[in-house]
Amino acid sequence: MGYPGKNTKQYSSPKRRFEKSRIESERVLAITYGLRNKREIWRATEVLRKHRSGAREVLAMTSSIGEAPKTIARRDELVGTLQRYGLLGPDAAMDNILSLKVEDILERRLQTIVYRKGLARSPKQARQLITHGHIAINGQRVSVPSYMVSIAEEAGIMYYATSSLGDEANGERQRIMNQRA
Protein backbone atom coordinates (compact mmCIF):
# COMPACT_ATOMS: atom_id res chain seq x y z
CA MET A 1 0.00 0.00 0.00
CA GLY A 2 1.33 3.39 -0.90
CA TYR A 3 1.35 6.69 0.83
CA PRO A 4 -2.30 7.81 1.13
CA GLY A 5 -1.54 11.45 0.37
CA LYS A 6 0.17 10.63 -2.91
CA ASN A 7 -2.21 9.83 -5.72
CA THR A 8 -1.05 7.62 -8.55
CA LYS A 9 -1.90 8.02 -12.20
CA GLN A 10 -4.90 5.97 -13.25
CA TYR A 11 -4.02 6.10 -16.92
CA SER A 12 -1.07 5.79 -19.22
CA SER A 13 -0.55 8.28 -22.00
CA PRO A 14 -0.13 7.00 -25.55
CA LYS A 15 3.31 6.02 -26.75
CA ARG A 16 2.97 7.96 -29.98
CA ARG A 17 1.80 11.39 -28.94
CA PHE A 18 1.21 12.81 -32.42
CA GLU A 19 -0.34 9.89 -34.27
CA LYS A 20 -2.98 11.49 -36.47
CA SER A 21 -5.48 8.62 -36.58
CA ARG A 22 -5.46 8.21 -32.79
CA ILE A 23 -5.87 11.94 -32.22
CA GLU A 24 -8.81 12.06 -34.61
CA SER A 25 -10.54 9.05 -33.04
CA GLU A 26 -10.03 10.51 -29.55
CA ARG A 27 -11.46 13.83 -30.70
CA VAL A 28 -14.58 12.09 -32.00
CA LEU A 29 -14.97 10.18 -28.72
CA ALA A 30 -14.50 13.36 -26.68
CA ILE A 31 -17.21 15.15 -28.66
CA THR A 32 -19.61 12.20 -28.67
CA TYR A 33 -19.39 11.53 -24.95
CA GLY A 34 -18.82 15.14 -23.80
CA LEU A 35 -15.49 14.39 -22.17
CA ARG A 36 -13.43 17.14 -20.61
CA ASN A 37 -10.05 16.00 -21.88
CA LYS A 38 -8.17 13.09 -23.42
CA ARG A 39 -7.18 11.75 -20.00
CA GLU A 40 -10.73 10.52 -19.51
CA ILE A 41 -10.39 8.45 -22.68
CA TRP A 42 -7.02 7.17 -21.53
CA ARG A 43 -8.51 6.23 -18.14
CA ALA A 44 -11.28 4.24 -19.85
CA THR A 45 -8.63 2.60 -22.02
CA GLU A 46 -6.70 1.64 -18.89
CA VAL A 47 -9.80 0.08 -17.31
CA LEU A 48 -10.38 -1.89 -20.49
CA ARG A 49 -6.72 -2.92 -20.58
CA LYS A 50 -6.95 -4.30 -17.03
CA HIS A 51 -10.05 -6.35 -17.85
CA ARG A 52 -8.49 -7.70 -21.03
CA SER A 53 -5.25 -8.66 -19.29
CA GLY A 54 -7.27 -10.44 -16.60
CA ALA A 55 -9.10 -12.37 -19.31
CA ARG A 56 -5.83 -13.30 -21.00
CA GLU A 57 -4.43 -14.51 -17.67
CA VAL A 58 -7.47 -16.72 -17.12
CA LEU A 59 -7.25 -18.12 -20.64
CA ALA A 60 -3.54 -18.84 -20.14
CA MET A 61 -4.20 -20.53 -16.79
CA THR A 62 -6.96 -22.61 -18.37
CA SER A 63 -4.71 -23.78 -21.19
CA SER A 64 -1.77 -24.57 -18.91
CA ILE A 65 -3.33 -26.12 -15.80
CA GLY A 66 -6.89 -26.77 -16.91
CA GLU A 67 -10.10 -26.00 -15.06
CA ALA A 68 -8.64 -25.59 -11.58
CA PRO A 69 -10.85 -24.12 -8.83
CA LYS A 70 -8.66 -21.01 -8.71
CA THR A 71 -9.09 -20.49 -12.45
CA ILE A 72 -12.84 -20.96 -12.27
CA ALA A 73 -13.12 -18.52 -9.36
CA ARG A 74 -11.05 -15.88 -11.17
CA ARG A 75 -13.09 -16.32 -14.36
CA ASP A 76 -16.40 -16.06 -12.51
CA GLU A 77 -15.19 -12.96 -10.66
CA LEU A 78 -14.10 -11.23 -13.86
CA VAL A 79 -17.22 -12.12 -15.84
CA GLY A 80 -19.48 -11.27 -12.88
CA THR A 81 -17.95 -7.82 -12.53
CA LEU A 82 -18.42 -7.03 -16.20
CA GLN A 83 -21.97 -8.41 -16.19
CA ARG A 84 -22.85 -6.28 -13.16
CA TYR A 85 -21.88 -3.17 -15.13
CA GLY A 86 -23.70 -4.31 -18.24
CA LEU A 87 -20.57 -4.71 -20.33
CA LEU A 88 -21.26 -8.41 -20.94
CA GLY A 89 -24.46 -10.35 -21.46
CA PRO A 90 -25.65 -13.13 -19.15
CA ASP A 91 -24.24 -15.92 -21.32
CA ALA A 92 -20.87 -14.28 -22.04
CA ALA A 93 -17.62 -16.12 -22.60
CA MET A 94 -14.04 -15.06 -21.99
CA ASP A 95 -13.64 -14.19 -25.67
CA ASN A 96 -16.33 -11.52 -25.29
CA ILE A 97 -14.11 -9.69 -22.80
CA LEU A 98 -11.36 -9.47 -25.36
CA SER A 99 -13.75 -7.94 -27.88
CA LEU A 100 -14.83 -5.04 -25.63
CA LYS A 101 -14.14 -1.52 -26.88
CA VAL A 102 -13.50 1.81 -25.19
CA GLU A 103 -16.96 2.95 -26.28
CA ASP A 104 -18.49 0.16 -24.17
CA ILE A 105 -16.76 1.54 -21.07
CA LEU A 106 -17.72 5.14 -21.91
CA GLU A 107 -21.37 4.12 -22.36
CA ARG A 108 -21.55 3.01 -18.71
CA ARG A 109 -20.44 6.37 -17.31
CA LEU A 110 -23.01 8.36 -15.34
CA GLN A 111 -22.57 11.32 -17.66
CA THR A 112 -23.54 9.29 -20.72
CA ILE A 113 -26.47 7.56 -19.04
CA VAL A 114 -27.91 10.86 -17.78
CA TYR A 115 -27.82 12.16 -21.34
CA ARG A 116 -29.27 8.97 -22.84
CA LYS A 117 -32.12 8.94 -20.30
CA GLY A 118 -33.13 12.44 -21.35
CA LEU A 119 -32.25 14.23 -18.13
CA ALA A 120 -29.96 16.62 -20.05
CA ARG A 121 -29.95 18.19 -23.50
CA SER A 122 -26.32 17.35 -24.28
CA PRO A 123 -23.45 15.32 -22.81
CA LYS A 124 -21.80 18.55 -21.69
CA GLN A 125 -24.94 19.63 -19.87
CA ALA A 126 -25.18 16.19 -18.29
CA ARG A 127 -21.66 16.68 -16.95
CA GLN A 128 -22.58 20.08 -15.56
CA LEU A 129 -25.75 18.80 -13.90
CA ILE A 130 -23.79 16.00 -12.24
CA THR A 131 -20.97 18.20 -10.97
CA HIS A 132 -23.42 20.79 -9.64
CA GLY A 133 -25.23 18.11 -7.65
CA HIS A 134 -28.53 17.92 -9.54
CA ILE A 135 -28.33 14.17 -10.22
CA ALA A 136 -28.88 11.36 -7.73
CA ILE A 137 -28.71 7.58 -7.86
CA ASN A 138 -31.33 5.93 -5.65
CA GLY A 139 -31.74 9.20 -3.74
CA GLN A 140 -27.99 9.60 -3.09
CA ARG A 141 -26.35 12.63 -4.70
CA VAL A 142 -23.48 11.73 -7.02
CA SER A 143 -21.14 14.44 -8.29
CA VAL A 144 -18.67 12.35 -10.31
CA PRO A 145 -19.40 12.25 -14.07
CA SER A 146 -17.07 9.27 -14.58
CA TYR A 147 -18.95 7.11 -12.05
CA MET A 148 -19.48 3.65 -13.53
CA VAL A 149 -23.19 2.85 -13.25
CA SER A 150 -24.19 -0.75 -12.66
CA ILE A 151 -27.30 -2.25 -14.20
CA ALA A 152 -29.05 -2.28 -10.81
CA GLU A 153 -28.40 1.44 -10.26
CA GLU A 154 -29.43 2.56 -13.73
CA ALA A 155 -33.15 2.65 -12.96
CA GLY A 156 -32.55 4.86 -9.91
CA ILE A 157 -30.95 7.77 -11.79
CA MET A 158 -33.05 10.91 -11.38
CA TYR A 159 -32.87 14.54 -10.36
CA TYR A 160 -31.87 15.07 -6.73
CA ALA A 161 -34.89 15.71 -4.51
CA THR A 162 -33.79 19.12 -3.20
CA SER A 163 -32.36 20.25 -6.52
CA SER A 164 -34.01 23.11 -8.35
CA LEU A 165 -34.43 20.72 -11.30
CA GLY A 166 -36.45 18.39 -9.08
CA ASP A 167 -39.43 20.69 -9.63
CA GLU A 168 -41.21 20.02 -12.92
CA ALA A 169 -42.06 23.72 -13.27
CA ASN A 170 -38.36 24.61 -13.54
CA GLY A 171 -37.60 26.43 -16.80
CA GLU A 172 -34.49 24.44 -17.67
CA ARG A 173 -36.26 21.18 -16.99
CA GLN A 174 -39.08 22.29 -19.30
CA ARG A 175 -36.54 23.01 -22.06
CA ILE A 176 -34.98 19.58 -21.57
CA MET A 177 -38.39 17.90 -21.79
CA ASN A 178 -39.41 19.94 -24.84
CA GLN A 179 -36.24 19.02 -26.70
CA ARG A 180 -36.84 15.31 -26.07
CA ALA A 181 -40.47 15.49 -27.22
Curated annotation (Swiss-Prot):
Q: Which residues form the S4 RNA-binding domain?
A: 108-180
Which Gene3D superfamilies does the record associate with it?
Answer: RNA-binding S4 domain
UniProt GO cellular component terms: small ribosomal subunit
Which PROSITE patterns does the UniProt record give? RIBOSOMAL_S4 (PS00632), S4 (PS50889)
Q: Which UniProt keywords apply?
A: Ribonucleoprotein, Ribosomal protein, RNA-binding, rRNA-binding
Q: What SUPFAM superfamilies does the annotation carry?
A: Alpha-L RNA-binding motif
Locate the coiled-coil region(s) and give their ranges: none
**InterPro entries, alphabetized:** Ribosomal_uS4, Ribosomal_uS4_arc, Ribosomal_uS4_CS, Ribosomal_uS4_euk/arc, Ribosomal_uS4_N, S4_RNA-bd, S4_RNA-bd_sf
- Any one Pfam family match given in the protein's UniProt record, by short name: S4
GO MF terms here are: rRNA binding; structural constituent of ribosome
Tell me, which GO biological process terms does this entry list?
Answer: ribosomal small subunit biogenesis; translation
Q: Where is the signal peptide?
A: none
Describe the protein's quaternary organization and the partners it interacts with.
Answer: Part of the 30S ribosomal subunit. Contacts protein S5. The interaction surface between S4 and S5 is involved in control of translational fidelity.
> What family is this?
Belongs to the universal ribosomal protein uS4 family.
The UniProt function text for this chain reads: One of the primary rRNA binding proteins, it binds directly to 16S rRNA where it nucleates assembly of the body of the 30S subunit.
Protein name listed in UniProt: Small ribosomal subunit protein uS4
Q: What is the lineage of its organism?
A: Archaea, Methanobacteriati, Methanobacteriota, Stenosarchaea group, Methanomicrobia
